[in-house]
């Protein structure tokens, strides 16, 4: 069961969630436009919890030339689960993804 929240707590949680969505959408837009590299996103994830919580599949799908099928195929090849976040990637998985998008 979820804990009861006061109106102020609920408003603060909604604001945090909105900020996370905006930041992740901005990252995906910058990736799609080529203004940001996959390595840049991994660097940001080390210092920014909102970026670190982004799903790997969503970030990979935002890369130029990547769609739903090619993203699923790549993540399967590397051994990355669908729900994995950037924070949860292992060293080898990061290296393989950076190599793929270099």
Predicted segments with their positions:
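Long, highly charged, low-complexity intrinsically disordered interaction regions
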Residues: 2-63
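Generic beta-strand or strand-like secondary-structure segments
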Residues: 26, 70-73, 96
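Alpha-helix boundary/capping and short turn/kink residues
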Residues: 47-50, 65-68, 80-83, 91
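Helix-hairpin-helix
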Residues: 59-75, 90
